[in-house]
A protein has these predicted regions:
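Charge-patterned, long linear interaction tracts outside catalytic cores
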Residues: 11, 26-30, 35-36
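Second-shell loop/turn segments in exported
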Residues: 22-30, 80-83, 179-183, 277-284
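Short, solvent-exposed loop/turn motifs
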Residues: 7, 12-15, 19-23, 131, ...
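Feature captures C-terminal
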Residues: 32, 36-260
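Primary recognition of N-terminal secretory signal peptides and signal-anchoring hydrophobic helices
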Residues: 257-339
Length: 339
């Protein structure tokens, strides 16, 4: 048995994509296999037309291979039961608008999507059974666009059934008068137990994404080399994650100066002693780090080390670095593996 217990089934591949930007969860800016799995389970168990569920934390994922209870708990940590309730098209759209309030409004020049810090991960629901767009150029309450049900525009007076957990039903949909209907069915077991049963029946489970929703109304300047440079600084830990407020290209010069100033202050610990690490610099839109200080610090020690770059370097004698050769532009003839 692994750390999370006995195997409950297996997957054919990882379910969550890599984050493009450190600390900006891919699962909150695009449809993913994790959310489609949860909503599929809810739809199958409830018989509802539409399902809504949240990614309770941005790092929730299912790895490739055997799946245990710890993995299931990671993607669904609360002991919720499932309700089926009647809603109108207008009520469903109002619910979707409530959920989309978690995003900040996009401004011209923003390089990333950011989030209102007042809305934790578990308050952002994603929907299955309908196709829709979220226009982040619009203010809160005006973002849900082009809602389609079975290939046709969803009408405000259209009657639907919705699968939703008991907590969301009571704490939001009813407490905030988003819907008028009451539950017509409640599960006898938890949603987490339903996911366990799904793996028992369907393993190996492949990560499938239907891409039924997307964010529109934004231009993240993905072809602009300035954006690539800033993203490199964020991912290297030289700029803070722009989670609650997007970085904007209008602030490019000051952000670069901030990143380079932080690079000057970084240190590396070698056998318990702090050493200066050399500065970051740029070449053709890529961010590189001079490791000559590190090489000199280790020279003659025979130390092997792990490198985890998040704005710092951790060095521990006896732990081998298993990565690829570290490219050092301008001194390629001296670029060693340090292993």
């Amino acid at each position: 048995e692994g750390e999370g217990g006995a195997s409950l089934g297996s997957t054919t591949a990882r379910f969550q994509p890599e984050n493009e930007i450190r600390g900006i969860p891919a699962g909150r800016v695009m449809d993913t296999a994790v959310m489609d799995l949860i909503n599929t389970v809810q739809l199958e168990n409830s018989g509802a037309d539409v399902s809504a569920a949240a990614l309770f934390k941005g790092t929730s994922d299912l790895p490739k291979g055997d799946i245990n209870y710890g993995n299931i708990f990671d993607i669904y940590k609360f002991d919720n039961t499932l309700y089926r309730v009647s809603v109108t098209g207008a009520e469903l759209k109002a619910y979707m608008e409530w959920s989309a309030e978690c995003y900040n409004q996009w401004q011209e020049g923003d390089i990333n999507i950011s989030f209102d810090p007042e809305y934790p991960d578990y308050l952002y629901d994603m929907f299955a059974g309908v196709d829709y767009e979220i226009d982040l150029s619009q203010p809160k309450g005006q973002r849900i666009q082009n809602v389609m049900f079975h290939g046709a525009p969803l009408q405000d007076d259209q009657e639907l059934t919705l699968a939703v957990n008991n907590y969301r039903y009571s704490s939001a949909l009813k407490a905030q008068s988003i819907i008028s209907g009451t539950k017509e069915w409640e599960s006898s077991n938890s949603i987490r137990d339903m996911i366990v049963a799904y793996f028992a029946e369907h393993s190996p489970v492949a990560p499938e994404v239907d891409h039924n929703w997307k964010i529109v109304g934004v231009d993240l300047s993905e072809d602009d080399p300035r954006r690539a440079e800033l993203v490199g600084y964020i991912n290297a830990g030289l700029l803070d994650t722009p989670y609650a407020e997007s970085y904007n290209l209008s602030d490019y010069d000051s952000l670069v100066a901030q990143a380079k100033a932080k690079a000057e202050t970084l240190t590396v610990t070698v056998n318990g002693a702090a050493k200066d690490v050399a500065t970051a610099f740029d070449a053709q839109g890529n961010t590189y780090y001079r490791l000559r200080d590190l090489a000199f610090a280790l020279k003659g020690t025979g130390a092997q080390f792990n490198v985890t770059w998040d704005g710092s370097v951790a060095v521990a004698t006896g732990s081998a670095y298993e990565g690829e050769a570290l490219a050092l532009p301008g001194i390629q003839d001296r670029a060693d593996r340090f292993a």
